[in-house]
């Protein structure tokens, strides 16, 4: 730790200790960027990524430098123009700072970092040359391959064909809509999971536009895509069970989707060999209540085994402590912004792996609009009770360190969502999504 030499006014002067230099500080001295937008994505996001890496359970100092350099060299150039008030903007569905959302995973084996981003083109901002932001996803994955990141490109290509807009479909939408005024035009996002020095890639795809053109509900397009990719029928049982449930909760026609309070919003999958891949179907529910959590957690009573019900009991405890405001949310018109009240709905995902008979569920609790520190103190107490002693002791101070220049007793937008899942083997598994 460096020491700032004190001015010796008297013998009682106490040395002042400077903050220890971090990998972010060191890299900031030597990294240069091609424009102010890239510079801003480094200045605004990299400090938090650096702190999350420092807090992670399995990142050596060398791996911290590795992941920050990868972000600077291979992710920032893909993020497009940084959002500036008064300039034409593009609504990334993630709702973080610009086109990226960091998140922190908590499990008994330790904490780890993930970030999700939408590769964004200048043409998507203007709404002219790339109105649905379709082209940058190919560039992003090509860049990752050149950088040595391993993933399954064939799975991406298969899903792209099934869910993303073709040139003809994009042109058809442009002929009938004022595209720049459309709230959400996203096609795909990429998530990068950091495991020590390794990186794994997930793909998120948004079905709304293509499903509308095909005149089928979102959930039907998503399940059809999984079935098309699943040539050997390894996901047949789980997708059939999920379809049976979704038919009871989601609209069955495109016309009904405009007023639906529950519907599928996107799907995700690991870009690995199909035998190891997990498909996840995400839905939201505008009715925020624990009764709705019970319905979706158990798939309307279809999931009623001991592990499912044990997880539900722990989730109930967490829900009661957090005191998330209940009620019906308005339809989502834009990502959350600083100063918003509790506007976000509940989210759930249903995970399916090859050979699974039934999906596994994860719940996402909306925290936007609630002061940060009360949430942090409740989470710290929860961590202590459920086998996360280090996180229980440190989380409040750690969160303050993530956002050192803000009054977290008042600020309400940084801890945006808390996801929760449960298994007999690992116990609670949680992720906090930071905006």
UniProtKB/Swiss-Prot annotation:
GO biological process: alkaloid metabolic process
UniProt cross-references to Pfam families, sorted A to Z: Trp_DMAT
Pathway(s) this gene product operates in, as recorded in its UniProt entry: Secondary metabolite biosynthesis
Binding annotation for dimethylallyl diphosphate: 114, 202, 204, 280, 282, 364, 429, 433
UniProt keyword terms in alphabetical order: Prenyltransferase, Transferase
Record-level Gene Ontology MF annotations: prenyltransferase activity
Enzyme class: transferase
Binding site for substrate: 101, 206
EC number(s) given by UniProt: 2.5.1.-
Functional summary from the UniProt entry: Prenyltransferase; part of the gene cluster that mediates the biosynthesis of the benzazepine alkaloid nanangelenin A which contains an unprecedented 3,4-dihydro-1-benzazepine-2,5-dione-N-prenyl-N-acetoxy-anthranilamide scaffold. The first step of nanangelenin biosynthesis is catalyzed by the indoleamine 2,3-dioxygenase nanC which produces N-formyl-kynurenine through the catabolism of tryptophan. The two-module NRPS nanA then utilizes anthranilate (Ant) and L-kynurenine (L-Kyn) to assemble the dipeptide product nanangelenin B.
Family (UniProt): Belongs to the tryptophan dimethylallyltransferase family.
Name the record gives this protein: Prenyltransferase nanD
